[in-house]
Amino acid sequence: LQKITGFIWTYAITNPGVNALRTPVYAEMVNIVNDKPVEFSKYKFDADTIRSMFDNFSFNNARPITKAMIAWWAYQNDKQPLLSLETTFEIEHIYARNRNEKENSLTDARNVESLGNKALLEKRINIRASDYRFTDKKKYYEGFTNSKGQVKEGTGVVELLDLTATSADFTENDIIDRYKKMIDCFINYLQKNSLIK
């Protein structure tokens, strides 16, 4: 399952379109039926090409691969417990889009839509936290009790909780560094699943 998932996600970026996936995936499904190993031996990826393709890919929120990648990333943290399937998750911009529009503080405005700036966040929290600076978002990520004594539960996404505990702000450099860690980790994942040449 990990090998097929890694292959499909990578192939969807390097060779977009459902039709492009049919040939390699069908051959491996035949191998499964015939009780042979799934190897994708004719379709191994080059790590540098993957990195370049990911760097040039637009991970916009309308693409299912965006949410899939950030969900995968959340579970690369060994401390991340399983999140409830009943919870609705949205894509959180850690460095708020609205903040960039108001402050014009990113040297490259495209970084606001970088995979390194996105995380899963429960919809009930994202509605309240979406337009704030990171220092203000921390309260919503961690949870709090409001002036009426109502407890507002925080996120179950461990990475966001770790960020609130260790970072005073989330800057453009943090976006770039986090993106690099994500891609390095994904390429390592492909390597572990024998999908790299």
Briefly describe each language-model feature range.
Residues 1, 22, 43, 62-63, ...:
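Active-site-proximal structural scaffolding
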Residues 3, 7-11, 28, 32, ...:
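Generic, well-ordered alpha-helical scaffold segments in large soluble proteins
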Residues 21-25, 29, 93, 156-160:
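Extended alpha-helical interface modules used as scaffolds for assembling large macromolecular complexes
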Residues 1-65:
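A cross-family structural signal marking well-folded subdomains
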Residues 82-114:
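Histidine-centered nuclease catalytic patch
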Residues 1, 10-21, 38, 79, ...:
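Intrinsically disordered or highly flexible coil/loop and linker segments, enriched in small
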Residues 56, 111-114, 118-197:
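Long, cytosolic, alpha-helical-rich C-terminal regions that act as interaction/scaffolding modules
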Residues 64-90:
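Short cysteine-rich loop/turn motifs with clustered Cys
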